[in-house]
Design a protein with these regions (language model features):
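Membrane-proximal alpha-helical signals and transmembrane carboxylates
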Residues: 4-10, 16-200
Length: 200
């Protein structure tokens, strides 16, 4: 009889703890990917959720750190980047700001260093807004691209490990063309030291 009672207590305990965990998971508004582009001289960040049940949320912000705060405050109080798969930047997005965003994510332990980075043009970003499933196609193309371009900076971790040479940071990002092909795009980012030298 005592054994049966213990088993019943355990079952009740597991049932209630399991339910609370499920509620917590459902409550979290998990982001699958983010796009960043420039519109009317302002930076626009759009957060696409993993479930796809909610519409993407767009905000105007100085950088990703501010964008996250605005989204949490006004739209998604339980915002989570723990399952973030990709960040897609407009090709004309400010390179220094892009690097600031990456460094911001580096400080967040919940964001995987294997999160992918992709560059795109306005047209491609517009297609994503119309059909976010396009990103799954780009993800598959990125896997094939990475096999043939191992030196490309396809993930956050690769950017974390890069060092400045001659006060410049040289990066090779994957770029998705209008035809859906991925090619390499070279980017050089001047360090703050070099910028100060040029001003003087």
């Amino acid at each position: 009889m005592k054994r049966i009672l213990v088993v019943l207590i355990l079952l009740v305990f597991l049932m209630f703890t399991g339910c609370s965990d499920n509620k917590r998971i459902d409550k979290a508004e998990v982001v699958k990917f983010i796009t960043a582009q420039t519109e009317k001289n302002e930076n626009k960040y759009t957060f696409y959720l993993l479930t796809g049940e909610q519409k993407p949320v767009s905000v105007q912000a100085l950088d990703l750190a501010e964008a996250k705060k605005l989204v949490k405050k006004d739209y998604l109080p339980e915002l989570s980047l723990s399952r973030l798969e990709m960040i897609i930047y407009e090709e004309k997005f400010d390179e220094n700001l892009m690097l600031d965003d990456v460094n911001h994510l580096k400080k967040s332990y919940s964001v995987s260093p294997l999160t992918k980075i992709l560059l795109a043009n306005k047209k491609t970003l517009g297609e994503i807004e119309e059909d976010e499933k396009k990103v799954d196609e780009y993800d598959e193309a990125l896997i094939r691209y990475k096999k043939d371009n191992k030196d490309s900076d396809t993930e956050l971790l690769s950017v974390y490990n890069k060092n400045y040479e001659d006060d410049k940071l040289s990066l090779v990002f994957p770029y998705i063309t209008e035809k859906g092909q991925i090619v390499s795009k070279n980017i050089e980012i001047a360090s703050k030291k070099l910028e100060n030298k040029q001003k003087n």
